[in-house]
Structures are given as C-alpha cells and as structure tokens.
A protein has these predicted regions:
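Residues that form or immediately flank small-molecule/cofactor binding pockets and catalytic motifs
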Residues: 3, 71, 100
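A structured beta-alpha segment of the ubiquitous adenosine-cofactor-binding alpha/beta core
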Residues: 1-9
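Internal alpha-helical scaffold of NAD(P)-dependent oxidoreductase catalytic cores
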Residues: 80-155, 159-193
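Rossmann-like NAD(P)(H) cofactor-binding subdomain of soluble oxidoreductases
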Residues: 18-80
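Structural motif
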Residues: 10-11, 37
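Short, well-ordered coil/turn residues at beta-beta hairpins
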Residues: 8, 15-17, 41, 113
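NAD(P)-dependent Rossmann-like dehydrogenase/reductase catalytic/cofactor-binding core
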Residues: 166-298
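A generic structural signal for well-ordered alpha-helical segments enriched in polar/charged residues
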Residues: 30, 57, 112, 178-182, ...
Length: 298
C-alpha cells in the first residue's frame, strides 16, 4: 500500500531501475507532501527531470524535494531474494536537486545517514556524470558472445574490458563530455571518475578499471536481457544522443551502441528512451536549459 508507505515518511529512497521512475512518480503522486525528500538512486540521465514532469502531468502544483544521485552508492549484486552482496562503497557520490538551490538543505538531512553524498552542481551535471552510460551498455554488447556462451561466468569489468573494448568506451566517453561541454557544463571523464569514486588510477581507462579493487570479483550479467542494456540504453544513452542531436553534437559511437542494442534485444530503444521531447526540453536554448536546472521552472 503506497499510501501507507509514504505516510509519515520524511525521505523516500527510490532504488529501482530508471525505467520505473515515471511509474513510481505516477504511483506516489497523490500522496506526496511538500516536506518530503525523494532521492533517485541513481537518476541515470534525466531522472529528476522525468520524475518532476510526471508529477506535473499528474496535476501537482506543490512538489516534494526531488533529488538524483549521480550513481548508486554501492558496487553490489543481488544474489537472491532479500540477499545482496556489497563489493565496495564509493568514497563520494554527487547529489543534485531540481531546482539546484535546494541542494544544501537536502544534503543537510541526507548526510545524517549517508555522509558519502556531496553537492552536485545541478541535475544536468549529475546526469552527464552518469558513468553507467559509458560502462554498462557498450561493455555488455561488446561481450555478448562471451556472456551467452558462459552465462556471465567471467569478471565483467576486469576481463570484459580488453584493449579494443576500452578504446570504444573512451570514444563513447569523449562524446558524453562533448555534449556536456556544449551546455557549458564541465564533467569528469570516466577515468577521473574511477579515481574520485574508488581511488583507482591508471594511464588509461583500461588500466584504471583493472586498478579498481571494487570491481574485482564482479561477474558479468548471466544474460543480455539485463538492466545494463534494458535500463542503461533508453535511460542513459538515448537522452545523451537526443540532447546531442538537439545541440548539434555528433554522437556516432553512442548511436551505434543504441542501434546494436535495439537489434540485439528486438526493442526500439529510441522509442522507449528519454528523448528531449519526453523530458520537456525540446527546442530550449542553452540558456533556458541552464536556467531550468537552477530554478526548476519549465
């Protein structure tokens, strides 16, 4: 009973695949109160904006505090019903709110339980620093044969990131950085993120991945019908590519991964994904998008 769950709650930690964010927003909308804090763990790309739009479409005029985490705090795996293994806890995870001026107040409350959360500049920065967009879809698709043959019986990050695969990840990462730069937002490279989140260093991305003890022992997905594709393609790569197209930033590598994922899964991820139309920012200028992040007003 969602009404009973929300009654008396001050903080709502939403820990579901991003494909469920809109459903959660629609389900909770009739019962949410202004004082409550909703944290998407994580938002992926555009999570807070999609959640806000879903509440607005439901008729809300007074909103709870909506926040999104840049990534999930834990490097973990579900091992069975009510059974999970935490491989590592990240050093820090940026968190941003819509609008951005809520960040200090929300963090003051959240940090009492989770000191790892730190201020993110705004929801577009946390969305662009969604490193799952870089690692998950491409790494899964490029290791599809190995995953299907072994049912994921290999170390996903350590063994899955060969020299050639790492080159593709770095190119995809470069396109992500270029889209952010077009909006005037400076974001970390995937290699820099590995150092910030896990203190892992290396001369290139592959070396940094191999140097991360938090990835040691993490197995690959046992099938391709997995959130690394079904969540991260439509909720991470599609919004990046869609925004890139609007800003006239070329994204051939991102587009290629979206296309391959769509063919492989028999799903039109462009249709299912978070496009600029669905996020309510189609046709907006760079100034208007940046103002939206600060004020929360469309």
């Amino acid at each position: 009973n969602i009404q009973e769950c929300l009654k008396g709650a001050d903080i709502l930690m939403v820990v579901v695949p991003a494909i469920a964010h809109r459903f959660i927003a629609q389900t909770c909308a009739p019962y949410l109160k202004e004082h409550q804090i909703v944290v998407l763990n994580p938002g992926r790309t555009g999570g807070a904006l999609e959640f806000f739009n879903a509440l607005k479409q439901h008729g809300l005029r007074r909103f709870p505090f909506i926040a999104e985490a840049q990534t999930f705090l834990y490097a973990s795996r579900a091992l069975g019903p009510a059974h999970a293994k935490i491989f590592s806890i990240k050093n820090t995870v940026p968190l941003a709110t819509l609008p951005a001026y809520w960040i200090p107040g929300v963090l003051k409350v959240i940090n009492r339980a989770f000191p790892q959360f730190i201020p993110g500049d705004n929801i577009f920065k946390t969305s662009f620093e969604n490193i799952g967009a870089v690692f998950h879809p491409a790494l899964t698709i490029l290791n599809a044969g190995w995953i299907e043959e072994t049912h994921g019986d290999f170390e996903y990050y350590i063994q899955g990131t060969s020299d050639s695969v790492a080159q593709i990840l770095e190119k995809l990462d470069k396109e992500r950085l270029e889209i952010a730069a077009a909006l005037g937002i400076k974001v970390m490279s995937a290699k820099a993120w590995l150092y910030t989140a896990y203190s892992a260093t290396g001369k290139d991305l592959r070396e940094a991945i191999n140097a991360n003890p938090g990835y040691s022992g993490i197995k690959a997905p046992d099938r391709l019908h997995h959130r690394y594709v079904d969540e991260d393609v439509p909720m991470s790569l599609v919004p990046l590519a869609s925004l890139g197209k609007m800003l006239k930033v070329e994204t051939p590598t991102i587009n290629a991964i979206i296309h391959l994922a769509s063919v492989m899964r028999g799903i039109d991820f462009w249709e299912k994904g978070r496009t600029v139309e669905k996020l309510g920012i189609k046709g907006m200028s760079i100034k208007e998008i940046r103002l939206l992040a600060v004020t929360g007003e469309l």
